[in-house]
Amino acid sequence: MSYSILIVDDSLPMRSVIKRTLKAAGYGNAELLEAADGKQAMELMKNNWIDMVITDYNMPVMNGLEFVKAIKKEDLSKDIPVVVVSTEGNDAKIKEFMDCGAVGYITKPFTPEAIRDLIVKILGEVNYEETLDGGDTDFDF
């Protein structure tokens, strides 16, 4: 199954790090969409199917908390899992995001394994090998 993952961060280098991490975790076939702030992300979400969002907190125009609140208000996006990646790792901030509907929170700097493990927990292990039953013959793809 191919996923569509929206990466929202005002830092282009950080978006690149997250994309490389996703590809290394087996999500290389996923459609990886990018936005520099929550407002751009909301526009992308109007025209694209999104399976998961990874967002920063500190961004211009619409920060990550405002963005998560906006997503969770919309019927079409309220069930999309949102993971927050931020330098703000205090318990109060994490609780605030989780109370607004985020399903995960990773503090920067992070290890690639931290993002991979959380995404696998949310979306499941990626396995592109499928077996079709053809009677007495199995076909592996």
Role assignments for model-derived ranges:
Residues 12-33, 100:
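Two-component/phosphorelay signaling modules centered on CheY-like receiver
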Residues 34-43, 64:
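Helix N-cap/capping motif at the beta->alpha junctions
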Residues 43, 65-78:
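Short amphipathic alpha-helix used as the core "switch/output" element in two-component signaling
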Residues 59:
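Receiver (REC) domain active-site loop signature in two-component systems and cognate sites
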Residues 66, 89-104, 117:
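Alpha4 helix (beta4-alpha4-beta5 surface) of REC/receiver domains from two-component response regulators
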Residues 110-119:
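C-terminal output helix
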Residues 127-141:
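CheY-like receiver
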